[in-house]
Each structure stands twice: as C-alpha cells, then as structure tokens.
From Swiss-Prot:
The lineage of its organism: Eukaryota, Metazoa, Chordata, Craniata, Vertebrata. Disulfide bonds: none annotated. It is an enzyme of class 3 (hydrolase). Changing residue 37 to A: Abolishes cleavage of mitochondrial transit peptide. Phosphorylated. This is Acyl-coenzyme A thioesterase THEM4. Its EC number is 3.1.2.2. Has acyl-CoA thioesterase activity towards medium and long-chain (C14 to C18) fatty acyl-CoA substrates, and probably plays a role in mitochondrial fatty acid metabolism. Plays a role in the apoptotic process, possibly via its regulation of AKT1 activity. According to PubMed:11598301, inhibits AKT1 phosphorylation and activity. According to PubMed:17615157, enhances AKT1 activity by favoring its phosphorylation and translocation to plasma membrane.
Length: 240
C-alpha cells in the first residue's frame, strides 16, 4: 500500500498543465476571471526576464525570442499557480470532488514557482511544434544547492521532468509521468545556466516517449541525459 501511495504522489507531483488558452479535453469555455489584485499577482508570467537573471540566461532568452518571430518557435508562459479555470476543469474530469479540500487548493502553488526571484528555479520554455522539441533555459538559484557549490540532483530531475512532460503535453494533451530515467554525467554549478533539450521520439497510443539532454550554454559540456514515458490521461476515468 505504501509503495502504491508513493507512486501516486510521485505521479501527481509530475503533472504538467497546459499553457494559457489550451483547455482540457471536453471542457467548456468559462467566463474570464475577475481582475482581483491577488489573482493578477498569481497569474503574473514568470517566464520573462527579472533582475535575478544572469547575462547568459538573458542572452539565450533573446536568441530564442528571435526564433519566435517567424512562428517556428513559441515561448510558453508560466505562473505561480494553476489558473482557477484549469483547477475546476481538472477537478471535473479527473478528481473526486469529495476528496478535495478547497482550503488546501486555495493555498497551492506550483513547486517550481514557489521561490522568490533568483532563489530557486528560474526558467523559460520554448516549443517547436513542427520538430516536436521543447527547450528549457534554466538557472538554478542558491536554495537548490545539493553538494556544496552545485545544484541538487533532485532539482535537476524536477526541471527535466517538467521539460519532457511539457513536450509530451504539447504534442498530445494532458499527461502524467509513468517513467523517468536520468543519467547524471557531471554536476551543475550553482547559479549557472543550462539548456534542457527535449525531443518527442515516438507515440504509441496513449504512450508518449520523450528524451532529453542537459548541456552547458556553449554546448560543450553534457551534464545529464534522460529518457521518459508519459501517459495521456483519459477524461472518462478519475484519478482518485
């Protein structure tokens, strides 16, 4: 039982949600959110430059924004918490409302966006729909330290999971992690910038296979490699 619970928690924790504008399968449009100041703060796009971004991250951001000009790539927005309409859609399709506590849900924040600027996960993702590629530009802050001076392996795994998961989701809809294998080649220096390059390799029914590598900005150092399997969720089946 404990093993089953742990697996379920790991899967839920690896959930990748859609960018703004993409709805869950079968969901109906809802009225726009009212403009409360707290909601505006929560829905502030965190994937744009802030003062904590170093020159490497800013330079890469500018380079990929240039690639977006012809429409081949697009930047994905990112927020501190899941927008209200997405929460309602997800609860409707995949969760038993009786098991959800509204107070806990109202306090929830996305793990990778729960740190103050510069202290944790600073990142932005770009997607190429034709090539089925997702690239994440990631700067790991001082609160992500593992071995002295280096980023914790779990933090690296988190960003790999988020990147390959978003790649699978953009290709096929709402997915959850079924398997993630990571080979760590070299430790990543704290507060440095890396590129996480992911690629959709194949699709078998509801199974999406995605691989990725983590490289230095100059692409001369390989830090990690990973393979993954994601399962597309069935709106007709609850997760609880």
């Amino acid at each position: 039982m404990l093993r089953s619970c742990a697996a379920r928690l790991r899967t839920l924790g690896a959930l990748c949600l859609p960018p703004v504008g993409r709805r869950l399968p079968g969901s109906e449009p809802r009225p726009e959110l009212r403009s409360f100041s707290s909601e505006e703060v929560i829905l502030k796009d965190c994937s744009v430059p802030n003062p904590s971004w170093n020159k490497d991250l800013r330079l890469l951001f500018d380079q990929f924004m240039k690639k977006c000009e012809d429409g081949s790539w697009k930047r994905l927005p990112s927020y501190k918490r899941t927008p209200t309409e997405w929460i309602q859609d997800f609860k409707t399709h995949f969760l038993d409302p009786k098991l959800m506590k509204e107070e806990q849900m109202s306090q929830a924040q996305l793990f990778t966006r729960s740190f103050d600027d510069g202290l944790g996960f600073e990142y932005v993702m770009f997607y190429n729909d034709i090539e089925k590629r997702m690239v994440c530009l990631f700067q790991g802050g001082p609160y992500l330290e593992g071995p002295p001076g280096f980023i914790h392996g779990g933090a690296i795994a988190t960003m790999i999971d988020a990147t390959v998961g978003m790649c699978a989701m953009m290709a096929g809809g709402i997915v959850m992690t079924a398997n993630l294998n990571i080979n760590y080649k070299r430790p990543i220096p704290l507060c440095s910038v890396v590129m996480i390059n992911s690629q959709l390799d194949k699709v078998e029914g509801r199974k999406f296979f995605v691989s990725c590598n983590v490289q230095s900005v100059d692409e001369k150092t390989l830090y990690s490699e990973a393979t993954s399997l994601f399962i597309k969720l069935n709106p007709a089946k609850s997760l609880t």
